[in-house]
């Protein structure tokens, strides 16, 4: 048996078509495009590539995208002032600060400064809390993309055993919560977990986000499992580098029923989910039309509407 390769680009295109239609309806109704502001600090090559991809996708989806590029020596206070400005801007529905940030800037302070209703990455504690309690809110883009990819090949999620390898606040923890909210039975593993291979072999759905190239091998995977590889690792080769995931694709494809490739799997869905979150923010903000800001630049907003 050779696994079905889940085409993340094709699934992302289908989601993007839906989001584009929503964006056009929004523009027709409210006389402006949904707006996304992307903030990049420094000149990290990988971050620059990611920002370019996001802004280009936004424009092709009917979202007005603005880029704010700041030098690497930008102070934390200066960055926070920019975020305050974007929070107040009624033409900006979503704010994304590209990670990682320079060492002198605390990411927690920056991400918490973004209004929860404009937090398209879903990283604000308010949105994390809504996800944890099973309420509607903005879900981090990569976990949301993982769920959509699984739904594209799995007839039923209820009661499925899901194992998430990795406990980062960006992917691992929210991914576990996303599948728990879908009525799956979820186990989350990390570097201190015992018998990681054994736990992985219990998974009907295996989500790997460990940041370790080729970590999950063929003998770690239950026959027929769905494997979602979130890892993106650069491996040096004679011509430069190649991208590989956290899963040994060549071996695991002969055991799994379906598997995502790297590249071309989770990555495109992450960007598509970002567009979906941006339009959702625009729709919610337009409906509520909030007029009052609190002193700390938090909108009086019913987050369950997002």
From Swiss-Prot:
NADP(+) binds at residues 166-168, 232. Its EC number is 1.5.1.5, 3.5.4.9. One of its GO terms (molecular function) is methenyltetrahydrofolate cyclohydrolase activity. GO terms for biological process: L-histidine biosynthetic process; methionine biosynthetic process; purine nucleotide biosynthetic process; tetrahydrofolate interconversion. Pathway: One-carbon metabolism; tetrahydrofolate interconversion. Keywords: Amino-acid biosynthesis, Histidine biosynthesis, Hydrolase, Methionine biosynthesis, Multifunctional enzyme, NADP, One-carbon metabolism, Oxidoreductase, Plasmid, Purine biosynthesis. Belongs to the tetrahydrofolate dehydrogenase/cyclohydrolase family. Catalyzes the oxidation of 5,10-methylenetetrahydrofolate to 5,10-methenyltetrahydrofolate and then the hydrolysis of 5,10-methenyltetrahydrofolate to 10-formyltetrahydrofolate. This is Bifunctional protein FolD.
């Amino acid at each position: 048996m050779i696994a079905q390769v889940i085409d993340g680009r094709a699934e992302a295109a289908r989601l993007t078509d839906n989001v584009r239609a929503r964006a056009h309806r929004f523009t027709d109704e409210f006389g402006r495009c949904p707006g996304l502001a992307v903030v990049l600090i420094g000149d990290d090559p990988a971050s620059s590539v990611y920002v370019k991809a996001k802004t280009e996708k936004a424009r092709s989806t009917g979202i007005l995208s603005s880029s704010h590029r700041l030098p690497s020596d930008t102070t934390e206070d200066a960055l926070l002032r920019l975020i305050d400005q974007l929070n107040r801007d009624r033409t900006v529905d979503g704010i994304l600060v590209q990670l990682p940030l320079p060492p002198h800037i605390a990411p927690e302070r920056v991400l918490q400064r973004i209004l929860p209703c404009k937090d398209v990455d879903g990283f604000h504690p308010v949105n994390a809390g809504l996800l944890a309690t099973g309420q509607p809110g903005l879900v981090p883009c990569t976990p949301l993309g993982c769920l959509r990819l699984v739904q594209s090949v799995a007839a039923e999620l209820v009661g499925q055993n899901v194992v998430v390898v990795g406990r980062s606040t960006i992917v691992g923890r929210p991914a576990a919560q996303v599948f728990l909210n879908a009525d799956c039975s979820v186990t989350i593993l990390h570097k201190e977990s015992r018998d990681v291979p054994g736990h992985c072999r219990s998974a009907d759905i295996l989500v790997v986000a460990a940041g370790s190239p080729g970590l999950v091998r063929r003998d770690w995977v239950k026959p027929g499992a769905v494997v979602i590889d979130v890892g993106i690792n650069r491996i040096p080769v004679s011509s430069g580098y190649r991208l590989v995931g956290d899963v040994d694709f060549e071996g695991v494809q002969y055991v799994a029923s379906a598997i995502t490739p790297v590249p071309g799997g989770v990555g495109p869905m992450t960007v598509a989910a970002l567009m979906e979150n941006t339009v959702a923010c625009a729709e919610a903000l337009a409906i509520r039309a909030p007029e009052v800001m609190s002193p700390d630049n938090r909108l009086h907003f019913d987050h369950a509407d997002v």
